[in-house]
């Protein structure tokens, strides 16, 4: 899978599917399930590393997990999903050269084919333009942007006409700078639909309603593995409960076996 194929999917009306992975095991599951895109998201800071936000994750963390995800793929390269890696907080906001170095490190030292970054401010658009000129495919991300949690919180974005127009202008600027697709998170469905209709690149939603070119979800949320469930991602199974019960069953079995009295060995035969 290559980035250009997602644009062809949009043109043909085929829905785009994207799921997250963070290691070889989760990558193998997502690949076997048939996702078009595997996102190594900086959400692994919370899902895997136990942080409260995505901010503490480093470029080294993202590279480590992206390498593991790529090793988990088993299909021939042409049949593998597109692997996209999130650039972490402050790896691309502190200058163009640093952004190119960070993105280049991910693509050079893993088998990822693209990177994703958040925001649509002019400084971010300039980063996208530079990366694309350097041959690095970029996926954009607007709406609720977790790396801006201390400024925007985890609130729904684009809820009034002024902010909707701003997000639309930012989306157009990201497309003009060369983004091959755009994630929109936790925005009104009508805004996502407007973006889908006016942009030539795919609009992939999460908590943005059904009027998108595709959808992305955190795999751990879909499997019901996380302690708290986001409102826009209903679990498809109670994975946490099932896993805990399976572990409890094994632990009980081991303890019960140990507690069962064993038949003492027969006494040794007397010497003749």
UniProtKB/Swiss-Prot annotation:
Q: Name one GO biological process term.
A: pantothenate biosynthetic process
Transmembrane domains' residue ranges: none
Q: How is the cofactor bound?
A: Binds 1 Mg(2+) ion per subunit.
GO molecular function per UniProt: 3-methyl-2-oxobutanoate hydroxymethyltransferase activity; magnesium ion binding
- Top-level division of the source organism's lineage: Bacteria
Give binding positions for 3-methyl-2-oxobutanoate: 42-43, 86, 116
Enzyme class, broadest EC rank:
transferase
Localization, UniProt: Cytoplasm
EC number annotated for this UniProt entry: 2.1.2.11
Q: What ranges does the record give for the region Disordered, renumbered to this chain?
A: 251-272
**Keyword rRNA-binding among UniProt keywords:** no
Q: Which of UniProt's keywords are assigned here?
A: Cytoplasm, Magnesium, Metal-binding, Pantothenate biosynthesis, Transferase
Q: Where does this protein hold Mg(2+)? A: 42, 86, 118
Q: Which Pfam families does the record match to this protein?
A: Pantoate_transf
Subunit composition and interactions? Homodecamer; pentamer of dimers.
Described function: Catalyzes the reversible reaction in which hydroxymethyl group from 5,10-methylenetetrahydrofolate is transferred onto alpha-ketoisovalerate to form ketopantoate.
Q: Which family does it belong to?
A: Belongs to the PanB family.
* Protein name listed in UniProt: 3-methyl-2-oxobutanoate hydroxymethyltransferase
């Amino acid at each position: 899978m290559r980035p250009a194929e997602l644009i062809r999917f949009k043109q043909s009306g085929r829905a785009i599917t994207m799921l997250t992975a963070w290691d070889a095991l989760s990558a193998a599951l997502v690949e076997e399930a048939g996702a078009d895109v595997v996102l190594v998201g900086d959400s692994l800071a919370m899902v895997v590393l136990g942080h409260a936000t995505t901010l503490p994750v480093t470029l080294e963390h993202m590279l480590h997990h992206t390498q593991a995800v790529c090793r988990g793929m088993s299909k021939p390269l042409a049949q593998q999903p597109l692997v996209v890696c999130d650039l972490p907080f402050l790896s691309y906001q502190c200058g163009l050269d640093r952004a190119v170095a960070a993105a280049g490190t991910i693509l050079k030292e893993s088998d990822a084919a693209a990177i994703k970054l958040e925001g649509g401010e002019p400084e971010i658009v300039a980063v996208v333009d530079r990366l694309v000129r350097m041959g690095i495919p970029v996926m954009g991300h607007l709406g609720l942007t977790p790396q801006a949690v201390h400024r925007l919180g985890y609130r729904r974005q684009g809820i009034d006409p002024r902010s909707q127009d701003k997000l639309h202008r930012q989306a157009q600027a990201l497309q003009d700078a060369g983004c091959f697709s755009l994630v929109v998170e936790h925005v009104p469905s009508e805004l996502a639909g407007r973006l889908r209709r006016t942009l030539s690149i795919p609009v992939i939603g999460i908590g943005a309603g059904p009027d998108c070119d595709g959808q992305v979800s955190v795999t751990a949320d879909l499997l019901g593995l996380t302690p708290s469930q986001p409102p826009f991602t209903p679990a498809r199974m109670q994975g946490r409960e099932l896993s805990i019960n399976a572990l409890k069953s094994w632990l009980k079995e081991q303890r019960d076996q140990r507690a069962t009295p064993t038949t003492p060995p027969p006494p040794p035969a007397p010497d003749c």
